Amino acid sequence: ASPFGLNKNAGKAGPPTRWLGGDAYQTNISEFDKGIEDSGIGKFQYILFDDCNMTGIEVAYELRNATHHIIGSPTEIMAYGMPYKLLWNELSKVNPDYHSICTNFINFYSNYKYGNTPYPYGTISVIDCSQVEGMVNIMKEINASSSLSIVVESDIQSMDGYVPSIFYDMGDYVRKL
């Protein structure tokens, strides 16, 4: 969900951290969740996002009842996107090996080149949505017992290239409390 290239009507889909898609087609994450629920098809085994910044706790919380797992990038994803050809063997299984999916993704991007220029960058995350409620409860306890005033935003690892940052590493946030 990138705020770059927003047009004057983009805010209609919600804040830039609450939707997926580009200028032409945007879907609010809560509406996406409701659409899955309303379809009656039940819970997905996984949802794979080939989009930037889609494995934050906010997305996982919103989709916790729609899917068992979320696969995606917690940061910006390279323009090439997901290397589906390498991932398909696992993605097509009833019970994918999520560790293997991550390993194949990392191996691909460790050797990725655009033209002759190496771009060995890529981040992937798999979230087990059955653990999201527990994480939310832990974070409530941590936030209630900590002085948030001591946290210096610029000291927390940013997960994006925006100025100012809008996505942060939750683990680093907790370590800085």
Predicted regions: what is each one?
Residues G5-L177:
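Terminal, contiguous helix-loop blocks that mediate binding/assembly
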